[in-house]
A protein has these predicted regions:
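Conserved Rossmann-like nucleotide-binding pocket used by diverse enzymes
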Residues: 1, 6, 26, 54
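A short beta-strand-turn-helix
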Residues: 3-21
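Conserved helix-turn-beta segment immediately C-terminal to the redox Cys motif
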Residues: 18-20, 37-56
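Non-catalytic, surface beta->alpha helical segment in thiol-disulfide oxidoreductase systems
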Residues: 78-105
Length: 105
């Protein structure tokens, strides 16, 4: 299951991670965010030990949402070496998200 990220845990969990990281920015009230949540949970389980997958609620992680200029949800950011290396905005299939992740492993 994808772990919940907070403003306080972001630096350690994402920026300092030696593994590639997906951060799924969404909100509880967002239908498309809820629709892709199972995909993120599946990727978290399938790539355990190879990548990390986090969820960040924009209503709770306002500083992060502002820092990365999250204007629409869902927005998925892909990090490697503490840097954003790819981005996806809107709905997508599990395959779309997985293909982007595979490029980072």
């Amino acid at each position: 299951m994808a772990m919940q990220l907070t403003d306080a845990t972001f630096e350690v969990e994402v920026l300092q991670s030696e593994l590639p990281v997906i951060v799924d920015f969404g909100a509880a009230w967002c239908g498309p965010c809820n629709a892709i949540a199972p995909f993120m949970d599946q990727l978290s389980e399938e790539y355990a030990g190879k990548a990390k997958v986090f969820k960040a609620d924009i209503d709770e992680c306002k500083a992060l949402a502002m820092k990365f200029r999250i204007m629409n949800v869902p927005t998925i950011l892909y990090f490697k070496g503490g840097q954003v290396v790819d981005k996806h905005v809107g709905m997508g299939t599990k395959q779309v998200f997985e293909d982007k992740l595979k490029k980072l492993i």
